[in-house]
Amino acid sequence: MSESKEILALFNLIDDPDEEVFFSVQQRIISYGLPIIPKLEYLWENTANQAAQERIENIIHQLQLKQLTEEFINWKDGDADLLFGALLVSKYQFPTMVAANSFQEIEKIRRNVWIEMNSYLTPLEQIKVIESILYNYYKVKGGEIVYDQVNEFTINKLLETKKGNAITTGILYLVLCELLGVPVKAIGIPQQFILGYFSSNNLEASDTSSLC
């Protein structure tokens, strides 16, 4: 049987009342990977059966989750880039998000900070420049961590709305500092998101910010 005929046959069985049959159909569809999603979306749009639509939605979600899980594993086994990891978290909530938009927005912020920077600034002055651009010019706000406010944990929504929580604003702050070569690091304190400016001598922090 050709691939297109098999897919059509599988789609015809999506509304099968036998759960065992549907499970086998579902697993076979998932084996096709992400490229089958547009076909599933087209099927959803042209299906009047609500139960079948729910099954299609679940299959699409499982396909996206499977791909995202693989991306997280690759991220963990690679260089574990902070921004890329944050974007993967966003992708769980917004599977169709375009990461390039977030990269472009961060680059705009970085350039605005960079224009105000020079090699003669003290560590405190560097921090003040970053915070002035981030919090005064861009009006970024990081509030209290509220776990049912899911969007506030996603870096893409922070960049779009300029509203997040201590975690997402802290991640954005760290990413900007890394891009600008400013030695700001996260400090491991339980239930807190604290950042510190570390001198080249390493352990002594000359400035910290809770970013709340």
Locations of the language-model features?
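A structural boundary/capping signal
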Residues: 1-212
